[in-house]
Amino acid sequence: DFSVEQLRADLHGLTPEEHGFTYLDVDREPSGRGRLSGWVLSAKDLCDVRGMPTTLGNTDRTYYPERSDAFIEALEKQGARIIGKSSTPELGLRVDTEPVGLPHPDNPLYPGCTPGGSSGGAAVQVARGLLRAAHASDGGGSIRVPAAACGVVGFKPAGKELGVQGFITRTVADNAFLHGHRMITPRARIGLLVEPLFCDANVD
C-alpha cells in the first residue's frame, strides 16, 4: 500500500535522515487525472514544484517558484501526486547526498553510509518503502549511483541533453510504466543480492 494515508503512518517517528525529504505537503492534490492517478511521488530538490521551496541542495539558495518545471507539470496533469521534495547535494554536483544546511539522508541498507547521489533522497524513500517511486535526474550517474547503493531500480533514459529526468523505483516494471510503457505483471522477487558474490576471492 503506497497511499498517502500509509505514507503518513510510515513517516511517524522517522527523522529527516531516515526519510530523505527536505519538504513535505502530503495534502497536495494533482492537477489532473490520467494514467498516473494513484501514484504518490516526491520531486528531486533541483526541480521546481509550484508552492514548494527549491533549495538546490543549499538552504542559502532557497526560493519559491511560481510554477513547476515542465516535467513535474506533466506528471501532475497525468494524475501523479507530488507530495514533497527529496534531498540532493548542492546543485547535484556530488555522488553523495550532503546538502548544505539540511540533514544528510542515511542509506537504509547500510546505516551510517551515504545513499549515493545526487538523487540520494529519492533512493532512500524508495528503499525504505515510503514511496513506490520517486522523481530523479541523471547527468553523470545521479540516478544510477544511488539506486545501486540502496538496492533499488534506477534508469537513465536516452536523450540529447546531458541531464535527463527519470525515476527511482522498486521494480523494473514500475520504471518502465512511468516512462510510458505498458504495465506488466512483475515477476516474483526470489532474492536481493546486497553483498558481492566473490568478495573474499583472491585476485592474482
Label each region the model flagged:
Residues 36, 161, 185-187:
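Short, flexible coil/linker segments at domain boundaries that flank nucleotide/cofactor-interacting
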Residues 42-44, 136-137, 156, 193:
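Short beta-strand segments
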Residues 68-179:
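Short glycine/serine-rich loop segments
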Residues 50-51, 135, 143, 201:
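Activation segment
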Residues 62-63, 112-113, 201-203:
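Residue-level marker of alpha-helix boundaries and capping positions
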Residues 1-64, 91-93, 198:
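Short, well-ordered alpha-helical
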Residues 54, 64, 68, 118, ...:
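Short, conserved glycine- and acidic-residue-centered signature motifs
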Residues 41, 47-50, 77, 180-204:
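Gly/Ser-rich, acidic/histidine-flanked active-site/gating loops
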